Amino acid sequence: MIGIFIEPNKELKIFINKWKKKIDKKFINTKLISHPPHSTIYYANLINDKDIIQVLKKTIKTIKSFKIYINKTLIFYDDKLTGGDTMCLAINKNDKLFQIQKQIVKKLKIFLKKDSTKSNKLTNSLLLTSMKKYGYPFVGKHWLPHFTIGSIKNKRNSIEFKKFMEEKIKFMNNVNYISAWKIVGNKHILIKRFKLKVNEKN
């Protein structure tokens, strides 16, 4: 599997890792906790081809750096992909992110492996359509960009969940790079960070 990510800056990364450690210490059988802090733009079963790197390089170098803002916590209850409740930090609505996702996915979908667009877990027609077309269920306006903390089962009434939802947060994150990762189970291996075009307005 290949993941295309936005990585958090230092301040945001510290906050995400603080919560990851807190949840990991408190609960067993958590999911996604060991994953490096990131926001997923695209995640799909792509053929392991060096051409992907060249395509990404060409695509990303045309994208100008930009800012994202994170002002609230979010929980995806009964997450179809994890079977638990997934704790996240929501990224404020940003049309630039949707444009970037569209650009990247359009270029990479030709590298999708055969039969990588099937899913037995999804029932939502919007997610199924996206999965069939792109090999990832969250491409388009229904995508909710976020940074994940972790996913936990049957703990939504815990003090930790309550504290997380009550957190007052305010982060601004400069996005100067987009990174590509190889993912095997819970193991994430950085392939390359691609620098975005300098934006004089940033």
List where the protein language model places each region.
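Basic, often amphipathic N-terminal segments
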Residues: 1-70, 75-78, 94-174, 189-202
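Short, low-complexity Ser/Thr-rich regulatory SLiMs
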Residues: 77-79, 182-183
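Short, basic/glycine-rich phosphate-binding loops at helix/coil junctions
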Residues: 80-84
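Short histidine-centered catalytic/ligand-binding loop motif
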Residues: 86-94
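Interaction-mediating elements
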Residues: 101, 180-183
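Extracellular glycan/ECM-engagement signal in secreted proteins
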Residues: 177
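Detector for glycine-centered tight turns/loop "hinges" at secondary-structure junctions
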Residues: 185-187
